[in-house]
């Protein structure tokens, strides 16, 4: 397990991805609604979609040995080793605007995305 704490302190390892306050706050709200403080947000990449890969989000109680763990505002974000390589440098955000409310991943590794934005290729 690789643990990373997102912080302004210069002595800590920089976070491999950006987990925004808006995303962490929304996850915290969803966990509170579920009533299970052991839940953690798992972000993953899997094959599929029209561009080859797609993002997935799920709640998980378990931390796997190969997970990278990021803590933000009391919320734990998990990324497995396979997904890590596709998500390094990405920003995981939550947007609530005229287009609706959703988690959004801005990924600098994606070379193309589909029209709906739910799949990508590298």
UniProtKB/Swiss-Prot annotation:
- What is the disulfide pattern of this chain? none
Instruction: Provide the binding site for iron-sulfur cluster.
Output: 50, 114, 116
| Quaternary structure (record) | Homodimer.
Which family is this protein grouped under? Belongs to the HesB/IscA family.
* Lineage of origin: Bacteria, Pseudomonadati, Pseudomonadota, Betaproteobacteria, Burkholderiales
Q: Does the keyword field hold Metal-binding?
A: yes
Q: One GO biological process from the UniProt record? A: iron-sulfur cluster assembly
Known InterPro entries for this protein?
FeS_biogenesis (IPR000361), FeS_cluster_insertion (IPR016092), FeS_cluster_insertion_CS (IPR017870), FeS_cluster_insertion_RrpA (IPR023063), HesB-like_dom_sf (IPR035903)
- Name of protein: Putative iron-sulfur cluster insertion protein ErpA
A single Gene Ontology MF term assigned here is: iron ion binding
Role: Required for insertion of 4Fe-4S clusters.
Protein keywords:
Iron, Iron-sulfur, Metal-binding
Which note does the record give on the cofactor? Binds 1 iron-sulfur cluster per subunit.
Cofactor annotation:
iron-sulfur cluster
